[in-house]
Amino acid sequence: MTTSAASGEPGRQRVLILGSTGSIGTQALEVIAANPDRFEVVGLAAGGGNPELLAAQRAQTGVAAVAVADPAAAEAVGDVRYSGPDAVTRLVEDTEADVVLNALVGALGLQPTLAALATGARLALANKESLVAGGPLVLKAAAPGQIVPVDSEHSAMAQCLRGGTRAELDKIVLTASGGPFLGWSAEDLKSVTPEQAGKHPTWSMGPMNTLNSATLVNKGLELIETHLLFGVDYDDIDVVVHPQSIVHSMATFTDGSTLAQASPPDMKLPIALALGWPDRIAGAAAACDFSTASTWEFLPLDNAVFPAVDLARFAGKQGGCLTAVYNSANEEAAEAFLDGRIGFPDIVETVGDVLHAADRWAAEPATVDDVLDAQRWAREQARGVVEQKSVRRGLVTK
């Protein structure tokens, strides 16, 4: 049985979960249920894609503070305190929490991220898009150490960086599984179907993150996130392919030492660490078994076949709202691919076309409205590019 936010038991962290019905959210609830002496749930929020699951989660946790962005889904859940486009943000503002886990998908997580930071709660951030889109605004709103990453790669970096000072850091090595199409040629990728792109070889993730991993856009977003979270120059962040997904990232220091964080691919480990930061949660996930033979491979990324990381590096170096443009153009193009309107390579091609027409958005955003305007522009541009590609490929007719 949970206690109210206002009367949380000493030593128990009050956790507000945004995106509770998604992959990260459901695993976070499992971590919390396994550690009732450490955590209690004080609120749940979801977009509304799975109202039945949200209703079940509410019954399981006993919380009254629930938000649903989709009003129709809110009716299906029943007796929802907050509904509509700003429901999640209002929930964050009204709920006392020690930790806000933002596991929403996409750029819609920006306003809740800023609201969470304004409350002073620790932000366990799985919604990388809000940081990528609103970078300068998010960093300005955050107190030192207030944001704790949930992504396995950035969680790994945070752990590795405990082993040295910032002045001693030489570079960050960001690892990538390579996705389901590692080793495929550019010609091979033309025949990829949404079903193929929805199967990841090592990780269990939501559909959008799985597709982003297949295109390597996810790694591009993580590159930008690395720069923003840890203040590392883009030229000092290497990306290497590690198909086994055991080493989640590495930090190389000026004396030649490299520290790596290794664990079997299981998101419960970084979720638990973010919820309990800086403390570890015993038994969060299985450890590596070094008593059995295994091989860890590290391969160069083929940027010619998978240009998404190079595009992200370009957007990040240009600065301003270009990282928001990168993300929003991808969201629009990815949706078009899933709908069968464009081919798989067209996703990243669309992002590149939009980015290279986005000079007007290179200025740093002064307000959230600046970011939202850049996102709207990017989506409109992407829709135009998608339509042109669809017509050329004969997938739609004018």
Swiss-Prot record:
Binding residues annotated for Mn(2+), in chain numbering: 151, 153, 222
Molecular function GO terms recorded: 1-deoxy-D-xylulose-5-phosphate reductoisomerase activity; manganese ion binding; NADPH binding
Annotated SUPFAM superfamilies: 1-deoxy-D-xylulose-5-phosphate reductoisomerase, C-terminal domain, Glyceraldehyde-3-phosphate dehydrogenase-like, C-terminal domain, NAD(P)-binding Rossmann-fold domains
Binding site for NADPH: 21-24, 47, 50, 127, 129, 206
Gene3D superfamilies noted in UniProt: 1.10.1740.10, NAD(P)-binding Rossmann-like Domain (3.40.50.720)
Keywords: Isoprene biosynthesis, Manganese, Metal-binding, NADP, Oxidoreductase
Cofactor or coenzyme needed: Mg(2+); Mn(2+)
Catalytic reactions of this protein: 2-C-methyl-D-erythritol 4-phosphate + NADP(+) = 1-deoxy-D-xylulose 5-phosphate + NADPH + H(+)
Pathway as given in its UniProt record: Isoprenoid biosynthesis; isopentenyl diphosphate biosynthesis via DXP pathway; isopentenyl diphosphate from 1-deoxy-D-xylulose 5-phosphate: step 1/6
EC primary class: oxidoreductase
Residues annotated for 1-deoxy-D-xylulose 5-phosphate binding in this entry: 128, 152-153, 177, 200, 213, 218-219, 222
Record-linked Pfam families: DXP_redisom_C, DXP_reductoisom, DXPR_C
Keyword field contains Transmembrane: no
Gene Ontology terms: biological process: isopentenyl diphosphate biosynthetic process, methylerythritol 4-phosphate pathway involved in terpenoid biosynthetic process
EC number from the UniProt entry: 1.1.1.267
Top-level taxon: Bacteria
Entry annotated with the keyword Manganese: yes
Protein's job: Catalyzes the NADPH-dependent rearrangement and reduction of 1-deoxy-D-xylulose-5-phosphate (DXP) to 2-C-methyl-D-erythritol 4-phosphate (MEP).
The family this protein is said to belong to: Belongs to the DXR family.
HAMAP family: DXP_reductoisom
Name by which UniProt lists this protein: 1-deoxy-D-xylulose 5-phosphate reductoisomerase
